[in-house]
Amino acid sequence: MDESFNSILEPENAWLFLFDDVSQLQQLPIVQNNQENFINSIDFNTGDVTTTNISGLNFQSLEESLNSDTSIENKPQIIEQIQFLQQQQQQQHDQIQQQLHNFQQQYQQQYQQRQQQYQQQYQKPYTPPSFIYSEKNDLVPQQQFHLGQENLQQPPQSLQQQQQPPSPSSPPQQQQQPQQQLQQLQQQHQQHQQHQQQPQFQQLPIQHELPQQSQLQHIQIQSQQIPTQPQPQQIQKQIQIEQPQVQVQQQIQPQQQIQPQQHIQLQQHIQLQQPQIQQQQLPPQTIQQKEINKKNQSKQSSNSMPLSQQIFFNTPKLDQHLLSYFQTQKTNNTINTLNVDQKRDNIEKQKENTSPPTPSSPVPTIINSNSTDINQISPSQQQQQQQQQQQQTTDINKILTLQQLEQQQLEYQKQQQQQQQFNLTFDDESKKSIKRINQNIANRNFRQRKKDHIKDIEDKMMELTLENEKLKKENESIRQQEHEGGTMAILKPSPEKKQLMLEIRSIVRQIGEALKEDNEKNLIYLLHMYHGAVAKRYSSIDKDAEQIASPEIQLRLASIGYVLKSTPFLTNIFQGIESDSWFNLFKEKANITSQQSVQLDIIREKYCEYNLKLLDEIHDLDSEVKKFFFQNIFVFQSYSISLKTSKPLDLSQQIEFACKLKLLKNKFFENSCLMFETFSSLSKILTPKQEALLLVEIDIFSCFNLKKFEMITNVWANKSKMKKSSDPFKIGDLSQIFEKP
């Protein structure tokens, strides 16, 4: 199928082409209407209808005429014209649609035909491409590549023929060999001229010039070695061959100036021929090994190379015109040196294989003005050339060794760098691993500590909960005992007492605020209120003393082992070491004068004397009451009293016990009255501000309830500390002791 085949339009893309045709078709009816349509003109004044040819009548003109004052019913001709125009438009629309449908069908048929043609083409056998990808990543035409290979294969044949040792029995065959080679060269020259005429293969004569020159040199060398005389016909043929070669070179030089791209392609072809010439000089085994290695390398490179790079290398390279002309000269020089080496090898082999030459006539030397080759080589020149070659080989070997050493050093440096990087990475990884291990250990230790701490807290919480439960149980048991005995009901303050205590506390707070405001009138009024509340408190002290001195409470206190230390009603601010320090601070704050301080000291001394006497008497009475209970109701282990003393008492004993309880009550009352009297005497000595300061610093009478509560708590605390073995044994009851005789 031709490469210049038109591109296929798919049915979807064909619509774009059709729309242009449709736009042209739509314009045709407009032109036809302007030329063919004839519209009747109407005379509205006379009512007669006249038909005239009007070009370009549209619906707009008809609508304007219809919208006039006259009615449509009186104009049937206009209606007919409108209907006629509508029919024409419908017909045109139908025609356009049919044409579009026909165009679409045609394009679909063409598309299907082209698809079938492409399928048939792909089913055909494979045809090789016109270009071949060379070993040096260059594109070379297929015919040119095959011709180059054929021409390269021909010189080795001539060389093989030269390398064969000439036998003494066949001198005429040696004479025929150069004739055959000259004929072959003439045929090749004719072929090159034919290829030059073709535009695609203009490069071939230049490419094959070098092998021809090499063959001519071989022929000349052989002609020197043959003992027979050269024929004049052969000399003429050589001259005829050399002359067209010079002409070809003269033709190539202007072509190189005109066509730089062709010159670049020639350089590429020469570079391709160099390794082939070197391979021909090597033995066949080495050539086969090199070919196998090249195939393996090409396979590996093709496998390792990605698709994008393969596509890039398969594309033609057009940027090589930057190469300079001196590269071609280098390649020519290298090829000439190779040819000279081949000549020398052939000469040495022929000398070894051939017998000593027979005497013969000297060979005439022919010098052509046009040729540049030398037909005879002296032994001195050969030695010089050999020395030069040896020097070149030694230099090349030195350069190669240096390059190898440099490469080894570079490889060693790269290996060292890789090892250093590996060591660094290994060290980093080892450090990271050590850090991770340490972090893991630290995390484990922290978690273990956290767990231990949580366990300790949980244990403490459990202990506290157990203690709380124990206290709850003890309180419940105490409440049951109190409700049974009725002691709590007796010791609890009445609501009246609670109100008095609250009033006294509120008055003391108001006094403190008045001191801050420095309002003397308000202070005096509040002090009168305070003294009135204290007077009410006197009446309640007698009842409190009776409750404490009752036989039931004393029995409970005796069973517990409570020892009375001071009055349970009021705090003592006048006696003891703490009172001394407190009074000194109070004097400084209240700015008390020397006279006031002397009077205060006298009052304190008197209070201490009377208070000590009362406390001694209270302790004596308390011990006698407890002794009575221990002898008659219950017994401790310390007392050596028999258990048979629980008989009812006599009247004298009962009266004596009652008197002791009454004396105890009076002593409690006297102690409380002593406190009130001393406080009233202090109010007479101090000013209102000083007295207010004293009340604010120590709220004496408002602490009564707290002292009572403290007394009860101390009682039950002593009871809980006592051991079970020290508990008293109950041997009687108050009701039995105080029975009437």
Swiss-Prot record:
Lineage: Eukaryota, Amoebozoa, Evosea, Eumycetozoa, Dictyostelia
Pfam families: bZIP_2
Alphabetical list of InterPro entries matching this protein: bZIP (IPR004827), bZIP_sf (IPR046347)
Keywords carried by this UniProt record: Coiled coil, DNA-binding, Nucleus, Transcription, Transcription regulation
GO term, biological process aspect, one: regulation of gene expression
Protein's cellular compartments: Nucleus
This protein's name: Probable basic-leucine zipper transcription factor I
General function of this protein: Probable transcriptional regulator.
PANTHER family: CREB/ATF BZIP TRANSCRIPTION FACTOR, GLYCOSYLTRANSFERASE-RELATED
Family to which the UniProt record says this protein belongs: Belongs to the bZIP family.
Organism, as annotated: Dictyostelium discoideum
Region ranges (Leucine-zipper): 434-441
GO molecular function, one term: sequence-specific DNA binding
Region spans: Basic motif: 431-432
Domain bZIP: 429-492
Coiled coil (residue ranges): 77-117
